[in-house]
């Protein structure tokens, strides 16, 4: 069964200031924890559109949310196509959108999905099991320079060159097939003193490959830009990020959206059309409480940012 600890459950949904008859989007259905809590706040006129590119997540959510089946629509799609998918269903604007950008724990924990550096499995890492690009293709077919780039940019890995060089050396002998082989390569490439510090040596490289396989950062940027155009006045977007790369994108897009145009200083009144369309609902990101961290260690790096479309 699809078990998933929902992070910042109440904060994320409560910050949307849910209207019982509103239209809402869960961009990252996952274990459906946020969806369930949100649906509980909707009446029969309200509706939730829930996106996930993983059919297993949708199948499990249909069971979990069966009592709300009349007010939820499941859409199997990457959230970067949210706007088109909603427009196709006659939805031009919504009251709120939430994102939980963590990889849902069941995907990490299912050995055959190939996300985990703790379990030996085929190199896969696809969120969408129908797409062609896999971790195996990245590791065996991408150039030395491209591997360095993703390890450094997406994994912030100090030993990117050494790991890419060792991958190149091994794959000339035979294709790299499994997560276990990749972990062995990483351990060989990273100097022993560094291996003993800062958690599992494979963590950063595996994160980088997962982001590359699923084009996660490109999808986040595309989706958030579209989400801002979908909001009704007074509507809000809640975004939970788990690492600095996604948080940087979210923070930048939200800051840009809340800026007005450059106007000469000292204007007595700023016309409405020059005022920004959005405001930050939280000056600083909301982080999990000590109590939540005790119950769910995966929440440690979570940050929640919220933006609101201004009613003019």
Swiss-Prot record:
Catalytic reactions on record: cytidine(1402) in 16S rRNA + S-adenosyl-L-methionine = N(4)-methylcytidine(1402) in 16S rRNA + S-adenosyl-L-homocysteine + H(+)
Assigned GO CC terms: cytoplasm
Keyword tags: Cytoplasm, Methyltransferase, rRNA processing, S-adenosyl-L-methionine, Transferase
Gene Ontology annotations of biological process type: rRNA base methylation
EC number: 2.1.1.199
Single GO molecular function: rRNA (cytosine-N4-)-methyltransferase activity
Database matches in Pfam families: Methyltransf_5 (PF01795)
Main location per the UniProt record: cytoplasm
Similarity section: Belongs to the methyltransferase superfamily. RsmH family.
Role played: Specifically methylates the N4 position of cytidine in position 1402 (C1402) of 16S rRNA.
UniProt cross-references to HAMAP family, sorted A to Z: 16SrRNA_methyltr_H (MF_01007)
The protein's name: Ribosomal RNA small subunit methyltransferase H
Organism encoding this protein: Listeria innocua serovar 6a (strain ATCC BAA-680 / CLIP 11262)
